[in-house]
Amino acid sequence: MSVLQEIIDGVREDLEPRRRDLPEARLAELVAAAPAPRDAHAALHGGRTDPAGIRVISEVKRASPSKGALAEIPEPATLARAYERGGASAVSVLTEARRFGGSLADLDAVRAAVDLPVLRKDFTVTEYQIHEARAHGADLVLLIVAALDDAELAGFLQLTESLGMHALVEAHTPEEIERGVAAGARILGVNVRNLKTLDVDPARYAALADGLPEDVVRVAESGVESEAQIKAYAAAGADVVLVGEALVRHGAPEEALRAFRAASLTVR
C-alpha cells in the first residue's frame, strides 16, 4: 500500500465521527453563515512578472510523513500573522491529524488572524470535506489528482468553485498535469515529491511545468529549503512557491519569507 493510500484511509476513518456529529444539513447552515471567500486566484496570479517577487503560500505545518515532527506551533495564528507581515500571498493550513498534526481548529485560528486567502491543505476525497472547508472559512482547497478519478476531480473542482472558493490542483506526473488541465484547473501545483518513496527532486519542476497553459497559475511544491531553490523555481516560470518546513523550522519566519521573495528577483 502506498503512503498516499495509507493517509487517505486514515482521513476516511477520521472523517466518520465528524460526519456523525455534524450532519450535512447542519453543515450547509454553517457554510451559508461563513464569511465570504477571499479571492485566492487574484492573490496568486501574476507571480512570474510581479516586480515585488514570486508569490509565496506559507504553510502552518507541524509534521510530515517524510520528516516526522517539524515544529510545535502552539499558536498557529501568531505564525500566520508573521507570514502576512513577511509578504505571504496566502497561508496554507494542514488539517490532517495523523501524519501532519493539523486540525480544523488551526484553520479557524488562522482564518481569523489574517486577511490573506487561506488554503485548507488536506486529502480531499469526499464532497463533505469541501463543504467542511468552506464552513471553517477556507478560501482554497487542495485536490490531489493522484487521489481522485476524472469524474471526482471535475466534480470536486466544480463544487469548490460553486462555493466561491478556488482549488489548488496538485499533480506529480505529466499525465496528472494533463488530467488537471482537462478538468479545468486554474491553479495547478506541480509537486516534485515522489508519492511512493517520498523523495524530492526539485530539478523535475521545469520539465513538468513546461507546456502548462499561460493562464494557469503555476505553483511549485516541495523542495524549497533555500534561496537557491526559490531562484530555480522562479527561473522555471513558477508564479508561486509553497513553503512549509523551511519556514516553520526557521527562527525568524518573517525575515526568511522576505529573503525568499527577494531572491526570486535576481532571475527576472
Curated annotation (Swiss-Prot):
Q: Tell me the Gene Ontology biological-process terms attached to this UniProt entry.
A: L-tryptophan biosynthetic process
Q: Which Gene3D superfamilies match?
A: Aldolase class I
Q: Is the keyword Aminoacyl-tRNA synthetase assigned to this protein?
A: no
Q: What is the top-level taxon of the source organism?
A: Bacteria
Enzyme kind, highest EC tier: lyase
Reaction equations catalysed: 1-(2-carboxyphenylamino)-1-deoxy-D-ribulose 5-phosphate + H(+) = (1S,2R)-1-C-(indol-3-yl)glycerol 3-phosphate + CO2 + H2O
Question: Which positions form S-S bridges?
Answer: none
Q: Which pathway does the protein contribute to?
A: Amino-acid biosynthesis; L-tryptophan biosynthesis; L-tryptophan from chorismate: step 4/5
Please name the GO terms that the record assigns under molecular function: indole-3-glycerol-phosphate synthase activity; phosphoribosylanthranilate isomerase activity
Enumerate the UniProt keywords alphabetically: Amino-acid biosynthesis, Aromatic amino acid biosynthesis, Decarboxylase, Lyase, Tryptophan biosynthesis
Q: Does the keyword Lyase apply?
A: yes
Name used for this protein in its record:
Indole-3-glycerol phosphate synthase
Please give the organism. Micrococcus luteus (strain ATCC 4698 / DSM 20030 / JCM 1464 / CCM 169 / CCUG 5858 / IAM 1056 / NBRC 3333 / NCIMB 9278 / NCTC 2665 / VKM Ac-2230)
